[in-house]
From Swiss-Prot:
Protein's name in the database: Anhydro-N-acetylmuramic acid kinase
The EC number(s) this enzyme carries: 2.7.1.170
Pathway assignment: Amino-sugar metabolism; 1,6-anhydro-N-acetylmuramate degradation; Cell wall biogenesis; peptidoglycan recycling
CDD domains, alphabetized: ASKHA_NBD_ANMK (cd24050)
HAMAP family reported for this sequence: AnhMurNAc_kinase (MF_01270)
Pfam families from the UniProt entry: AnmK
InterPro entries in UniProt: Anhydro_N_Ac-Mur_kinase (IPR005338), ATPase_NBD (IPR043129)
């Protein structure tokens, strides 16, 4: 089995930066050693948002974004290597998720698209890359997401304690880790995505730091109820979603019935939407003893407080308490998935995604042996 140092690269639906994690991985352990977050330039963020929200673009524009993101990911990796004084030969492989710009796992031709050309990452780092993790699962009839529950189970599963792991990124997803049962997991709906989109449009701020703006507002109950009637929330698992569904246009359509709504009240309502939609799914699955939260939303004190209030009797805490940085969880997961691919081990869980079988995931982009010698 391949073992040694791996790097995970993750750019999620929140678009709050490229997370890069260095970890030592083998069949018995995943030990995080270093991490950094690399900024996404404004022009790239705008290009990604335009695609995700269905704005027209040419194939040339898509190709340019693909190349530019690949180069950006390479810059982030090289920055981490320089900080740790490591050479390409010290790294077995990079596991790169890419940037999801469209995710449509149902219909006549299910598909998902992550951009950020892995060839450019190899060329500019000299390190083998494993990428394109989701499309094999979709080819096998699965949702292609979420893939992280397998990692949650490997790191945070417990033989007797009923646990759930909640990742609040742009989209929120839940992993059900119940002793003696197959792992399950799915996307519950919007995490930070709508909150971030609203404050960006209203205040030109990338996110609501410490939920300060939302705390100034009051929940608009009729708006909350209207949003919660969206069919996605009542749909059965397996299910997954993304920015192509829960985007600013979705929010605007719901706001048409509330002209003149105070912007702070809308922000408070979006925070409540995230908390309530998650709590409903936790309770629908019978609850748990511990809800372990990771992702950028775990730093939102209002969402965390509301989760605790909506889920009495359940310990709500961040994964940091278990020794795993909530900010780095997903990047770490894709480093681990790269290790599994190189080891010839399956990376998906059919009980989570609905695929017909477990499978080795991803495509391998080998480095030139000269650069890794």
């Amino acid at each position: 089995m391949k073992s040694g140092r791996f790097i995970g690269v993750m750019s999620g639906t929140s678009l709050d930066g490229v997370d890069v994690v260095l970890a030592a991985i083998d069949e018995t352990m995943v030990a995080q050693q270093a991490s950094l977050t690399w900024p996404i330039p404004v022009h790239l963020k705008k290009g990604i948002l335009d695609i995700c929200q269905g704005q027209p673009l040419t194939l040339s524009q898509l190709g340019q974004l693909d190349t530019q993101l690949g180069r950006l990911f390479a810059q982030a990796v090289n920055a981490l290597l320089a900080r740790q004084r490591l050479q390409p030969r010290d790294i077995v492989a990079i596991g790169c998720h890419g940037q999801t710009v469209w995710h449509e796992p149902t219909g006549e031709a299910p598909h998902t698209l992550q951009i950020g050309d892995n060839n450019h990452i190899v060329a500019h780092t000299g390190i083998t890359v494993v990428g394109d993790f989701r499309r094999r699962d979709i080819a096998l009839g699965g949702q292609g997401a979420p893939l992280v529950p397998a990692f949650h189970h490997a790191l945070l599963g417990h033989p007797t304690e009923k646990r759930m792991v909640l990742n609040i990124g742009g989209i929120a997803n839940l992993s059900l880790l119940f002793p003696g049962q197959a792992v399950r997991g799915y996307d519950t709906g919007p995490g930070n995505m709508l909150m971030d989109a609203w404050i960006w449009r209203q205040c030109a701020q990338p996110y609501d730091k410490d939920a300060a703006w939302a705390k100034e507002g009051q929940v608009i109950l009729p708006l909350l109820q209207k949003m919660l009637r969206d069919p996605y929330f009542a749909a059965s698992a397996p299910k997954s979603t993304g920015r192509e569904y829960f985007n600013y246009g979705w929010l605007e359509r719901h706001l048409t019935a509330f002209p003149g709504a105070d912007a702070r009240d809308v922000q408070a309502t979006l925070a409540e939407l995230t908390a309530v939609s998650i709590a409903q799914q936790v309770l629908l699955n019978g609850g748990c003893e511990r809800l372990m939260v990771c992702g950028g939303g775990s730093r939102n004190p209002l969402v965390m407080a509301r989760l605790a209030a909506l889920l009495p009797g359940i310990e709500v805490s961040t994964t940091d308490k278990a020794g795993i940085s909530g900010d780095d969880m997903e990047a770490l997961a894709f480093a681990w998935l790269a290790w599994r691919t190189l080891a010839g081990l399956p990376g998906n869980l059919p009980s989570v995604t609905g695929a017909t079988e477990a499978s080795v995931l991803g495509a391998i982009y080998p480095a030139n042996p000269i650069t890794q010698s």
